[in-house]
Amino acid sequence: MASGENLAPRDAKVISVILRSLGIEECEPKVIIQLLEFAYRYTTDVLEDALLFAKHTGRTHITTSDVKLALQTKVGRHFVPPPPRQYLSEISTMVNSKPLTIPDGENLIRVPPSSSALLNLDYEVLRKDSDKKRRIY
């Protein structure tokens, strides 16, 4: 994946192997860094929540039940499944059944003519036999 893969941390190599197992042979190095950041942030959040649950029950050590509870609370907030296809189809049919409004000509912003535009190209095509002098800017 990356040219300096031998210098990468162990977790980056693990993510690289996971990507390869999914059929992704090449990617930008930023992809692996972003996945590492997500994994570290998600793991840290889960462990902090598990510690809060353990403290709430009066324990100083985190148990597997604390981690499971923390994971269950995270899944509902972070990994929301998309709505069913049939539901999206019904909504799109309802929205698309209304015709688009045609704006009034009075309420539109009028664009100035191209001759007065600042970015207009100002050029003339001169014939070889023309007596007009060429202007050079």
Curated annotation (Swiss-Prot):
Keywords, alphabetical: Nucleus, Transcription, Transcription regulation
Coiled-coil annotated spans: none
GO biological process, one term: RNA polymerase II preinitiation complex assembly
InterPro entries: Histone-fold, TFIID-31, TFIID_subunit_9
CDD domains on file: HFD_TAF9
Domain called Histone-fold: residue spans: 9-71
Cellular localisation: Nucleus
GO molecular function, one term: transcription coactivator activity
The organism's place on the tree of life at top rank: Eukaryota
Any one cellular-component term (Gene Ontology): SAGA complex
UniProt cross-references to SUPFAM superfamilies, sorted A to Z: Histone-fold
Biological role stated in the UniProt entry: Functions as a component of the DNA-binding general transcription factor complex TFIID. May also function as a component of transcription regulatory histone acetyl transferase (HAT) complexes such as SAGA. Binding of TFIID to a promoter (with or without TATA element) is the initial step in preinitiation complex (PIC) formation.
Quaternary organization: Component of the DNA-binding general transcription factor complex TFIID. Component of histone acetyl transferase (HAT) complexes such as SAGA.
Sequence similarity: Belongs to the TAF9 family.
Protein name per the record: Transcription initiation factor TFIID subunit 9
Native organism taxonomy: Eukaryota, Fungi, Fungi incertae sedis, Microsporidia, Unikaryonidae
